[in-house]
């Protein structure tokens, strides 16, 4: 399944706020889950499905990519759900978004694809690149690249950068301080339900 490219407002009306997908916050419609709970099996499946969809649309990844992340998380030490969130949060496109270099993850992904982003010096054009503690995120020393980032940083300064990241506004340089903890996740999500959804597939 490919990435969603349709109307974003329709998605957040159904799933709730997804800051990675869009910064719009329209009035939410009543969830179909709360309207019909007569069949418990279907209701629980829908709840797990919607939590899974939240991750997919927020981080802008395909179904196959999410399944692969779940499989990796299952093999790692620690809570599968927490490791899954850490893997998604440490993607380069998401780190750029959380640093405030672009207001959405799809926009941040374009910055990476168009070769505007450097990690520890070299250009990295892979949005799924896994950032690590002490990685430096910078932009190409070109007028166009700097103009794009500067405009977004000024807009995004009103939002708090999470503790696992630091951004130097003068040097236009981001730093990954550490692997983030659960409290720093920028999305309202129950990751255990996502793990349960994939329990028979991963």
Swiss-Prot record:
Belongs to the universal ribosomal protein uS4 family. One of the primary rRNA binding proteins, it binds directly to 16S rRNA where it nucleates assembly of the body of the 30S subunit. With S5 and S12 plays an important role in translational accuracy. Coiled coil: none annotated. It comes from the Eukaryota. Its main location: plastid. Part of the 30S ribosomal subunit. Contacts protein S5. The interaction surface between S4 and S5 is involved in control of translational fidelity. One of its GO terms (biological process) is translation. Disulfide bonds: none annotated. One of its GO terms (cellular component) is small ribosomal subunit. HAMAP family: Ribosomal_uS4_B. This is Small ribosomal subunit protein uS4c. It is found in: Plastid, Chloroplast. GO terms for molecular function: rRNA binding; structural constituent of ribosome. InterPro entries: Ribosomal_uS4, Ribosomal_uS4_bac-type, Ribosomal_uS4_CS, Ribosomal_uS4_N, S4_RNA-bd, S4_RNA-bd_sf. It holds the Pfam family Ribosomal_S4.
């Amino acid at each position: 399944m490919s990435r969603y490219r349709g109307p974003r407002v329709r998605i957040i009306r159904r799933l709730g706020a997804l800051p990675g997908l869009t910064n719009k916050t329209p009035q939410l419609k009543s969830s179909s889950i709360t309207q019909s709970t007569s069949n418990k099996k279907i209701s629980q499946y829908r709840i797990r499905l919607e939590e899974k969809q939240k991750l997919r649309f927020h981080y802008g990844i395909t179904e196959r990519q999410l399944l692969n992340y779940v499989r990796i998380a299952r093999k790692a030490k620690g809570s599968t759900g927490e490791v899954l969130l850490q893997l998604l949060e440490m993607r380069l496109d998401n780190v750029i978004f959380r640093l405030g270099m672009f207001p959405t993850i799809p926009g941040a992904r374009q910055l990476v694809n168009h070769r505007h982003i450097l990690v520890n010096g070299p250009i990295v054009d892979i949005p799924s690149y896994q950032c690590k503690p002490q990685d430096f995120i910078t932009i190409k020393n070109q007028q166009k690249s700097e103009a794009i980032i500067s405009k977004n940083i000024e807009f995004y300064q009103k939002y708090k950068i999470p503790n696992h990241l630091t951004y130097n506004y003068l040097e236009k340089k981001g730093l990954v301080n550490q692997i983030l903890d659960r409290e720093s996740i920028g999305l309202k999500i129950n990751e255990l339900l996502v793990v349960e959804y994939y329990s028979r597939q991963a």
